[in-house]
Amino acid sequence: MHAAVTDRLALEAAIRRGLERDEFRVVYQPIVALERGVLLGVEALVRWEHPTRGAVTPAAFVPVAEEAGLIQPLGRWVLEQACRQGAAWAAAARAAGELPFSVTVNVSARQIEDAGFVDEVRDILERSGFPADHLVLELTESTVMRHPELARQRLAALKALGLRLALDDFGTGYSALSHLRRFPIDVLKIDKSFVDDVAAGGEPAALVE
């Protein structure tokens, strides 16, 4: 128990130093329409190359950042990087006579619940020059259902900025299905377990009907 606590505190301190020393980076995963082979957009993913630990997986550091209250500065940094890069890509696309593609950025429950998050997003969009309608903020079903009414208000305010909203892992909490229409979601990513259960005629199939 003591060793686990010590390791967690050490990782938390390392995350703080990593933010100060620019050890994090953003990589972009293509989102492609397979039937047409067309690039629809990219998803911004955070990576951490620690000077002594080496590559630290998001599964290892993101939960610690969440618990330590570090996900807000980390998430802000990722959003800033993604919007700056997105603005550069959009300018290049326009110069080539092509349509800009979207950039998707994941946001956490703590970011959504932060009273200053909407203003933060607005400020980043304005400073970066990235068109709001090409930004997609992605959150999970569990994030919106943690505090549904607060999430609904925050998402409505974010939508008013002109960006799009995506819901990931939908179907992991079936009770939320009837509440989906309350949220201004543009893109729905359905969890594979939900699809499998629908095909098998389980409880989700009845909910879909």
Question: Each predicted region: which residue ranges?
Answer:
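Helix C-cap/alpha-to-beta connector motif
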Residues: P73, W77-V107, D123-H134, L161
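Residues at alpha-helix caps and immediate loop-helix transition turns in enzyme cores, especially N-
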Residues: D7, T57, G116-V118, L150-A151, ...
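Signal-transducing alpha-helical linker
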Residues: A3-A10, A14, E20, E66, ...
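The catalytic core of metal-dependent phosphodiesterases that act on cyclic dinucleotides
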Residues: G41, R122-V198, G202
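Structural preference for long, well-ordered alpha-helical segments in enzyme cores
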Residues: L11-A14, G18, A44-L45, V64-A65, ...
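Conserved long alpha-helical elements within nucleotide-processing catalytic cores of c-di-GMP signaling
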Residues: A59-P63, Q72, A156, S178, ...
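Active-site core of bacterial EAL-family cyclic-dinucleotide phosphodiesterase domains
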Residues: H2-V64, A92-A93, F101-A109, E138, ...
